[in-house]
Amino acid sequence: MKEAGILFEELVSIMEKLRSPEGCEWDRKQTHESLKPYLIEECYELIEAIDEKNDDMMKEELGDVLLQVVFHAQIARERGAFTIEDVIRTLNEKLIRRHPHVFGDSPGYSYKQWEDIKAQEKGKKKSSRIGEINPLVPALSMARRIQENASQVGFDWKDPEGVYEKIEEELKELKEAKDPRELEEEFGDLLFSIVNLSRFLNVDPESALRKATRKFVERFKKMEELIEKDGLVLEELPIEKLDEYWEKAKGGDET
């Protein structure tokens, strides 16, 4: 742990140097706003490394995310807002405060206690147990979080069968929808129910959809290779022929 502290101090010093007049022009120009796309990108690259179970890649991407934390803290320090020490101190205090069953005299963990503590931190009256909608969080993840919050207070299906039935009901309503407004609403209800099912199956919907999309892209590229190998042009083939090549590409997945 002592070495980690030394290395972290070195990282902070490196960032200070990069932001100094003698440092890097690009780093000096960055602001909280200009760094937002990089923060999002690094987080998704870390998620990709986790999905691929690639430890070397995960190690590197965790470092890139940490860099973003140090970068923003340095910019804030220059503005006189807060320092990296403030960031760490605030985090430490929050972790201890939110785990009284570990660091205090509380007998055990409870969801209600967790929510009460969070409400006290925000200095306001208790908010709804269902949580708030964050427009910046991906829709699938937000739906999953809201459903988990509802489940914590007992508002949930007893088993997956109820969710399967709900999906069939929503699909039927989608087929019967007429105008664009109805279609959007019913499609949203169907997606919400599918995300609900993901909870019961212990499947992360974002990860599952990301993997399915990646699989589709890889198969499509394989199909393109097979078509080109046969001296044909993809755009000129009828759908029936494309389906044949698609099946061949799928077969290649299993080899």
Curated annotation (Swiss-Prot):
User: What are the protein's UniProt keywords?
Assistant: ATP-binding, Hydrolase, Magnesium, Metal-binding, Nucleotide-binding
Q: Which reaction does it catalyse?
A: diphosphate + H2O = 2 phosphate + H(+); a ribonucleoside 5'-triphosphate + H2O = a ribonucleoside 5'-phosphate + diphosphate + H(+); a 2'-deoxyribonucleoside 5'-triphosphate + H2O = a 2'-deoxyribonucleoside 5'-phosphate + diphosphate + H(+)
Residues annotated for Mg(2+) binding in this entry = 169, 186, 189
Keyword Nucleotide-binding in record: yes
Give one Pfam hit by family name. MazG
Uppermost EC category: hydrolase
Q: What is its EC number?
A: 3.6.1.1, 3.6.1.9
This protein's cofactor list reads: Mg(2+)
> Which Gene Ontology BP terms does the record give?
dATP catabolic process; dGTP catabolic process; dTTP catabolic process; dUTP catabolic process; TTP catabolic process; UTP catabolic process
Activity control mechanisms = Inhibited by AMPCPP (alpha,beta-methyleneadenosine triphosphate).
Q: Which InterPro entries match?
A: MazG-like_dom, NTP-PPase_MazG-like_C, NTP-PPase_MazG-like_N, NTP_PyrPHydrolase_MazG
Q: GO molecular function terms here?
A: ATP binding; inorganic diphosphate phosphatase activity; metal ion binding; nucleoside triphosphate diphosphatase activity
Gene3D superfamilies for this protein: MazG-like (1.10.287.1080)
Temperature characteristics of this protein: Optimum temperature is about 80 degrees Celsius. MazG is very stable at high temperature, and no change is detected up to 85 degrees Celsius.
| Binding residues for ATP 2 | 215-219, 246
Q: What is the effect of changing residue 176 to A?
A: Has little effects on the NTPase activity
Effect the entry attributes to changing residue 41 to Q: Reduces the NTPase activity to 10% of the wild-type activity
Q: Which residues bind ATP 1?
A: 162-166, 169, 182-185, 189
Record annotation: effect of changing residue 45 to Q: Reduces the NTPase activity to 10% of the wild-type activity
Please indicate if the UniProt record lists Metal-binding as a keyword.
yes
| Summary of subunit composition and partner proteins | Homodimer.
Q: What does this protein do?
A: Catalyzes the hydrolysis of all eight canonical ribonucleoside triphosphates (NTP) and deoxyribonucleoside triphosphates (dNTP) to their corresponding nucleoside monophosphates ((d)NMP) and PPi and subsequently hydrolyzes the resultant PPi to Pi. The NTPase activity with deoxyribonucleoside triphosphates as substrate is higher than corresponding ribonucleoside triphosphates. dGTP is the best substrate among the deoxyribonucleoside triphosphates, and GTP is the best among the ribonucleoside triphosphates.
- Family of the protein in this entry: Belongs to the nucleoside triphosphate pyrophosphohydrolase family.
What name goes with this protein?
Answer: Nucleoside triphosphate pyrophosphohydrolase/pyrophosphatase MazG
What organism does the UniProt record list as the source? Thermotoga maritima (strain ATCC 43589 / DSM 3109 / JCM 10099 / NBRC 100826 / MSB8)
Q: Which gene encodes it?
A: mazG
